[in-house]
Amino acid sequence: MAKKSMIEREKKRTRLIEKYADKREALLEEFRSAASPLDKLEIHRKIQQLPRNSAPTRHRNRCWLTGRSRGVYRDFGLSRNVLREWAHEGLLPGVVKSSW
């Protein structure tokens, strides 16, 4: 299980991403449409002024039950270990063990 501080840090990142999403998207659109290099430089500086953790690339998918960061299935939000346990116990409707 991941440390509680890591889980809370990830939650904080998620809140920051949501808070600055509109502003960041507007600046990036302005950056893409800017013609002169000086304008691009100015806009780039504005983007750099935003909090580092407000960038979506810093977000890490984590299991909502254990906080595990690797082997997380997006469809369920669970790590592979928990997914396997719950599937065997029949706690995930529609999930069956494959056989051929």
From Swiss-Prot:
PANTHER family: 30S RIBOSOMAL PROTEIN S14, SMALL RIBOSOMAL SUBUNIT PROTEIN US14M
Function, in words: Binds 16S rRNA, required for the assembly of 30S particles and may also be responsible for determining the conformation of the 16S rRNA at the A site.
Name the UniProt record assigns to this protein: Small ribosomal subunit protein uS14
Gene Ontology CC terms: cytoplasm; small ribosomal subunit
HAMAP family per the UniProt record, alphabetical: Ribosomal_uS14_1 (MF_00537)
Pfam families (alphabetical): Ribosomal_S14
One MF term in the entry's GO annotations: structural constituent of ribosome
Organism: Nostoc punctiforme (strain ATCC 29133 / PCC 73102)
